[in-house]
Each structure stands twice: as structure tokens, then as C-alpha cells.
Amino acid sequence: MEAIKTFSPKFGFQISLSPRTHLTPVRFPPTACPVKPANLVRLKATRALIRDPQESNRKFQKFPPSEWTNRFDSVSVDASEMDALRKEIDKIIPNVKKELMSSQGIESTKKKILMVYLLVSLGLAYHFEDEIEECLKEGFETIEEMMAGEDNLYTISIIFLVLRTYGHHMSSDIFQKFKGNDGNFKGCISGDAKGLLALYEAAQLRTTTEYIMEEALSFTSSNLELLAADGRCPPHLSKHIRNALGLSQHKQMEVLVAVEYISFYEQEKDHDKILLKFAKLNFKLMQLHYLEELKVVTKWYKEHDFASNLPPYFKYVIVENHFFAITMYFEPKFSQKRIMLAKYFTVLVLLDDTCDRYASLSEAESLTNSLERWAPDDAMDKQPHYLKFVFKFIMGCFEEFERELASEGRSYSVKATLEEFKTIVKANFDFAKLAHTGHVPSFKEYMEVGEVEVGVCATLAGNLMCIGHIGDEGVYEWLKSRPKFLKAASTYGRLMNDIAGFEDDMKREYVITGVNTYMKQYGLTKMEAIRELQNLVEYNHTIMNEEFLKTTDLPRQIRKQVINVARSLNVSYTEGEGFTHTKGKVDEYITSLFITPIRI
């Protein structure tokens, strides 16, 4: 096995784990790292599969390796091309900044906010964070004056959308002007495709008590479906509408919004040629960054030789893990952090697959005890090879994170993430115990465990660990307090997972799910239960929107991470169980990000 050059070789996999191997406790975090680690000779990993003797007696779904796993480990990225792209981008940025900081005045502010929407949609906003904050602060302070006399549905909706996206609580009462005396939205706006689409997107940021935005969502959805289907819109606009109805901008990954919007914007007759070129150059540069990262993570993945050490219950999805890391932060400056986050997601997937799909109850208990102690329990020495491998791999990954972040003075973030990880370890074992008994608990009892097991808080902890100094110790205290924001996100994730994965769970005779517990408790049919749970999903979506606006004591970048975790769930589960069965939308998204070239 080739040495991993990014990290010190001291803490890599240096021993061969056979069923007879006694695991020496490896304490974490390491406290006695020599400045210059001893030179170690690594043995090449064996290619012979070490089989679990009980494998043939277990019921489990075999997962073939993802077709993406071998696609990027030998990819070649031209550094000079990346430099050339950066130079072209750097020439454009000052001109865009001038527009954002141009003359003052109400009409000028409106135009600048509409421009911010373009920058967000094209994936360019991160270049202008300070300028955008200043522009929106000015706009929100003069919002009443700015909206006085304004009756353009598109303009009002976009201003509402942008201000809410950046944490400014603009009132939804402004949309009353588009309702008639009968209390319904006026029929005269039903043919305004762009205005309706903007209102539809604005309604995605509604809070729990904004009934007018609930009405707006219903009104726009039905009318947009008709407009997209009856040929009244240009083909590119119809396609844009259908994409939004499938997954709105607010619920979609930011970089995927950019991919789709660049294509749409190019076909708009009044598009800004410079801005369009900027967006294409920027996406091309990001795509090259992603390819570089994929080369690193797929090489790391293969060096651990999962195929030889694990039965085929494990999902080989390192490219997919990296794809979901992009959901959390897509900007080029987070390149190294995405690599670390993809590794962390691999840990989460391995833990979940092991406890949920393969391990016996006694094996899951031994793994749980060992991870909670951060040392092998008394039973680990007697466990099959695969379980020892899982335990050693997880410990090795956290040690790797510690080594990388210690140099940044951020060891606290690894410790805090490890503690959060241990909560999901326990929840996985609690789920395994429930499944073993065959007893279907009440919906409330199920959710108490399920909201932890789905891993929203553990995912967020990993995001904060990787994001940098903005994820300080105070943020982890907020995370540990389990505020309403995180409770809603966890409920949202648990129910989306259960609804999307219901048929898959039933096929493998896994009955302890949210759908089943809800059916049993309330005497409902499957479809009735799913409809009610979908309503709960949407309600928790509005709670997250509300808490995003209320939680002003945290930086917006941290609050946005909660929204980004929800976005990853949307991408995974809106059209089936997209993470377990990646064929379909997730495959399309991966192709658009990593494979399809953009024409500049």
C-alpha cells in the first residue's frame, strides 16, 4: 500500500488484522507525536478476501462497487489551465464589484438586489460576500420606502427571496397586494411565468405562520405546471420551471443551482455576456478543483482495500461521499476541507452499513462499546476480522483528522466531533436492539432514537470540524444544546429517510421505520401515513426557515450549514433513496458536476 503523503505515516494502518490479532488500544487524541516520525515500511495490502465465517448465514443486501469509484483515481488536471482561469476571473471581479457598490438610491438598490440574485443563482456570490452584505443591509433598512409603489411580482418576490436567504426577515405582507377582494391570488398574474416562478421560489422560505406564503406555494405550483405543459413558455423557460418544481433553488445544492441556471441564463435574450462568461469560467475552475480532490480521495479509499477486508454489505461510494461534501461548501477555498469531509462521510456510511445491514447484535454491541471507550472492549479480540477492521479504520480516520487540524490549533473541533459521533454510534446500536426484538415501538419512542441515528447533528459536527475557525468552541456548545433549529432538521432528515427508503426496508424485512410506527400508532394505511409524514416534513422545513432567521447570535455561515445538511437530504431523498440506489438523479448530478464539460 502506497504511503499517504498528506499525513504523517505514524498513524496509518501498519498492522495486518487477522482474526487472532490482539488490538492494542490506540488512544485518541495522540499526545506523544514525535516531530519526525520513524520511517516505517508498509506492507502492501492483501488482495485475498478475508471472509467472515458467518457471512453465508446472514441475510444482507450485497452492494456492487459504484461505477464511479475507478473513474477519477488517475485523472490529470492541468495546473496551468487553472492558473489561466483564475487570471481571467480576477480581471472580471473588479467590474462586478463596481456595479454592486454603485450609486445610492432606492431604484439603484433594487437593481443591485436583483443582481445579487443573479450572482447567487450563477454560483458567483462567494466572490462578493462583503459587498453583498452591505448592499442588503442598505436594502433592508429602507425596505418600506423601496417597496412603496412597487407592483412588479418578479421584483418583489426576488427581493424577498434574497433578503430572507441572507437572514433578513422581510415581511410577507407585501404579497397581499397580489390578492383580490375574494382573498385569493388575482387571476391576472397566473400567466406571468417569471413572476410566478419567483413567487414560488420565495414561498420556499416561508415560516410556520405565514399562511399567505402557503397559499402562494399552492397557487404558483398549479399554475406553473400548466404553463410548463401547454407551450406558452419558451422551451428553456419551461425546462427551468420543471426543474424548480422538482426541487426549488432553496432546497437544491448551490452548485447544482448554478449548473442549471447557467444553461437557462445563456438562453435568455437579455443576458449579460460578461456575467455569463464569468459564471462559466468560475464553474470550470470549480470543476477542476473537484477532479483534483476526487483523485486524492479515491486513492485514499483504495489504499484501505475495503473489498478485501469487508463482506459486500458496504456501499462503495467514495465519489458520492465527495459529491455530498460539495453540498456543504462548494467554493474552491474549501478544497482541502472537502477531502477531509468526504473521509468523515465514509466513516458515517461504514458505521451505518455495519450496524444496520450486517453486524449481529453482539458484534454491534462490541463495536459500540469499543468506540465509546475509544479502545477495544473485552469482546473485540474474539470478533471477526471485518469488525476489527471497521473499528481500526474509524479510529485511524479520527487520528488523521487530529493530525491535520492540530496544526491549525483546532484539536477541540476533532474532540467535539468525536463526542457527537459517539451519540450516533449509540443510536445505531439502539436501532439494532429494536430490530432484534421485532417489537414495533410507538412513533414517539422511535423518533427519540431515529432522530439521532439519521445523523444530522453528527454530519453538522463534521461540517464544522472541516470548515475552519468559524466553527469555534462556542458553536459546538450550541450544537450540544440541541436547539429547535437542529431538532427540526433531525426530524426532517429522519422522516425523509424513512419515506424514501420504506420499500427498500420492507424488502429486507426491516420493519422498525417511521412509516410503520406511525401506521401502527394511528391505525392508518401506508399511503395515509406517508401523506401525514410528508406534511410533517414540510412543517419542519418551515421551522428551519424560521429558526434560520431567529438565530441571530450565530454567524450566517454556521446557520447556513444546517440548511446545507437539509439540502443534501433533499438531493438524496426527493426522488427515492438516492444514496443507497444512486442510479438516477444522483448519477445525473455527478455527471453534470464532474464529467460534462462547460462550453466557454
UniProtKB/Swiss-Prot annotation:
- Give disulfide pairs as residue numbers: none
Under which pathway is this protein filed? Secondary metabolite biosynthesis; terpenoid biosynthesis
Entry EC no(s): 4.2.3.195
DDXXD motif: where is this motif?
Answer: 352-356
Quote the cofactor binding remark.
Binds 3 Mg(2+) or Mn(2+) ions per subunit.
Picking any one GO molecular function of the record gives: magnesium ion binding
Which positions does UniProt annotate for Mg(2+) 1 binding? D352, D356
* Residues annotated to bind Mg(2+) 3: N497, D505
Q: Which cofactor does it need?
A: Mg(2+); Mn(2+)
Q: What is its main location?
A: plastid
User: In its keyword annotation, does this UniProt entry include Glycosyltransferase?
Assistant: no
Q: Name one Pfam family in it.
A: Terpene_synth
Name the UniProt key words of this record, in alphabetical order.
Lyase, Magnesium, Manganese, Metal-binding, Plastid
Q: InterPro entries attached here?
A: Isoprenoid_synthase_dom_sf (IPR008949), Terpene_cyclase_plant_C1 (IPR044814), Terpene_synth_N (IPR001906), Terpene_synth_N_sf (IPR036965), Terpene_synthase-like (IPR050148), Terpene_synthase_metal-bd (IPR005630), Terpenoid_cyclase/PrenylTrfase (IPR008930)
* Swiss-Prot/TrEMBL catalytic activity: (2E,6E,10E)-geranylgeranyl diphosphate = rhizathalene A + diphosphate
* Any one biological process term the GO annotation gives: diterpenoid biosynthetic process
Compartments reported by the entry: Plastid
User: Which tissues express it?
Assistant: Stele, and tips of primary and secondary root.
In terms of SUPFAM superfamilies, this protein maps to: Terpenoid cyclases/Protein prenyltransferases, Terpenoid synthases
Q: Which residues bind Mg(2+) 2?
A: D352, D356
The cellular component terms of Gene Ontology attached to this UniProt record, alphabetical and capped at eight, are:
plastid
What does the record say about domains? The Asp-Asp-Xaa-Xaa-Asp/Glu (DDXXD/E) motif is important for the catalytic activity, presumably through binding to Mg(2+).
Q: Could you say which protein family the record assigns here?
A: Belongs to the terpene synthase family. Tpsa subfamily.
* Job description of the protein: Catalyzes the synthesis of the semivolatile diterpene rhizatalene A.
Specify the protein name.
Answer: Terpenoid synthase 8
Q: Source species, please?
A: Arabidopsis thaliana
